[in-house]
Amino acid sequence: MNYTDLKDKNLNELQVLLKEKKVLLFELKAKLKTMQLTNTSELRATKKDIAKIQTALTAVKAN
């Protein structure tokens, strides 16, 4: 996910996307705790996606 993809979205789309990513992060953390997660780099990528979405949300709210 690139920031350039996110800056074209409106506020509602970004909020929905943020909620989906947070749910995914929760599921990944649960899988990690139960030793079901084999690719731990997914956690890092999901956290970075959440940060990008939050940055885009801040930019949209500022305008």
UniProtKB/Swiss-Prot annotation:
<dbReference type="Pfam" id="PF00831">
    <property type="entry name" value="Ribosomal_L29"/>
</dbReference>
<dbReference type="GO" id="GO:0006412">
    <property type="term" value="P:translation"/>
</dbReference>
<comment type="similarity">
    <text>Belongs to the universal ribosomal protein uL29 family.</text>
</comment>
<keyword id="KW-0689">Ribosomal protein</keyword>
<dbReference type="GO" id="GO:0003735">
    <property type="term" value="F:structural constituent of ribosome"/>
</dbReference>
<dbReference type="InterPro" id="IPR001854">
    <property type="entry name" value="Ribosomal_uL29"/>
</dbReference>
<dbReference type="InterPro" id="IPR036049">
    <property type="entry name" value="Ribosomal_uL29_sf"/>
</dbReference>
<dbReference type="GO" id="GO:0005840">
    <property type="term" value="C:ribosome"/>
</dbReference>
<dbReference type="GO" id="GO:1990904">
    <property type="term" value="C:ribonucleoprotein complex"/>
</dbReference>
<protein>
    <recommendedName>
        <fullName>Large ribosomal subunit protein uL29</fullName>
    </recommendedName>
</protein>
<keyword id="KW-0687">Ribonucleoprotein</keyword>
<dbReference type="InterPro" id="IPR018254">
    <property type="entry name" value="Ribosomal_uL29_CS"/>
</dbReference>
